[in-house]
Amino acid sequence: MTKQIITLVGRPNVGKSTLFNRLSIRKKAIVHDLPGVTRDRKYTDGKIGSFEFLLIDTPGLDENPNSMGERLIEQTTKAILEADLICFMVDGRSGILPDDKLLSSFVRKYNKPAILVVNKCEKAFDFDKEYYKLGFDSMIAISAEHGTGLIDLYDEIIAKLPEEESIETNIADPIKGDCLQIVVSGRPNAGKSTFINALINDERLLTGPEAGITRESIEIDWQYKNNHIKLIDTAGLRKKSTITESLEKLSASDTINSIKFANTVILMIDALAPLKQQDLNIASHVVNEGRSIVIVVNKWDLVKESEKEAFQEEFYYQINTHLPQVKGIPVLFISAINKQNIEQVLDACLKIYKIWNKKITTSKLNEWLNFTTKAHLLPLQKGGRRVRVKYMTQTKTRPPTFKLFSNNPEKITDSYTRYLVNNMREAFDMPGIPIRFIYVKTKNPYV
């Protein structure tokens, strides 16, 4: 039995994202008092009491004649078509506005089961005739922020959905096993959402020429070559000095948080915008968090054929110069809008994810250590004794982390550590991922 789908619809700033977070098993949506914060439809597992369902949050719709408004309507229409039940939300403080009337007509034409949810009702609330004129036979007053009225909402949802579907325990999602979480990050307008839409063949994410369309992290469950993948589209990261709007600060922190919990990060670069320090800063942040990384240069179709070879040479030089700690990062050149080379990106993610999870036996590690330290001797200490690394073992994966036991670890230089790490990459085929060494002092410094 699949989960029932409930879609939240309403004009901007009526509290859809607040209710989405309230019903979600974990918080997902950015909440802000600026209209239009949500710009894509977002999915999460929701729960009220014992009833579990799939919840969709939609962009706030208003009378907007520009292309952005048309795309918001398209996103909401798709979410309505997917729904088993619609919660049409209005603001109880401001009352019924002209946009509410237009939207209610828009929703009712699809003949879906629907509930009018009047939000921001912290006090006792009486429905006047304006609410009845919207044409919904079920009306509930709630405060999503404070959680009041949710029991009434639960009862109304159960009444609206087929009993055998809603009351029974829902079977978990059919996709099982490890989930590879891939975060797509980069500067604004690099083509992150276009890339994800091309991969899944669905206009799930709002795209367009306006920089900063995606304002929060959007998660999409997907399967690729029998692998369960969660694709996460993030807001574009700008330099801190250029982030002035408070909502964008929230979006930036949401993106950074997504990177922290990712397995692999796709760093999207705009081929028409030169590689900037901010791109390198994002890559360094990913590496410092211990994530695996794939660099993708998008809009490759817009680069002149005569300039591509020189572009690639300069690009590889910049990456190798500024990110020496992760030599061998996969770099792919794609056109998301033309779907050129996009599957190669997923293949690279699967490959580097495998390396990121690599486990090396202790015997092989110490055989390698003995050979490598003899090929390039460690420095001498005072008194003529040589620094030694006696033994090493792998303590964890994701990223591969190793403990090395030395008689005097303080004397091991950063350059010698880089020598060991780079040698390990080649010996054990571990390109493009962070490798961490932890030095531990042996009890007997003379051993």
Curated annotation (Swiss-Prot):
GO molecular function terms listed in the Swiss-Prot or TrEMBL record: GTP binding
Signal peptide: none
Keyword Lipid metabolism: no
Span of domain KH-like: 358-443
Swiss-Prot/TrEMBL keywords: GTP-binding, Nucleotide-binding, Repeat, Ribosome biogenesis
Pfam families: KH_dom-like (PF14714), MMR_HSR1 (PF01926)
Gene3D superfamilies (alphabetical): 3.30.300.20, P-loop containing nucleotide triphosphate hydrolases (3.40.50.300)
One BP term from GO: ribosome biogenesis
Binding annotation for GTP 1: 10-17, 57-61, 119-122
Source species, domain of life: Bacteria
InterPro entries, per database record: G_ENGA, GTP-bd, GTPase_Der, KH_dom-like, KH_dom-like_a/b, P-loop_NTPase, Small_GTP-bd
Domain EngA-type G: 4-165, 180-357
Residues binding GTP 2: 186-193, 233-237, 298-301
Matches recorded under PANTHER family: GTPASE DER
NCBIfam families from the UniProt entry: GTPase_EngA (TIGR03594), small_GTP (TIGR00231)
Family of the protein in this entry: Belongs to the TRAFAC class TrmE-Era-EngA-EngB-Septin-like GTPase superfamily. EngA (Der) GTPase family.
Function of the protein: GTPase that plays an essential role in the late steps of ribosome biogenesis.
Assembly: Associates with the 50S ribosomal subunit.
Annotated protein name in UniProt: GTPase Der
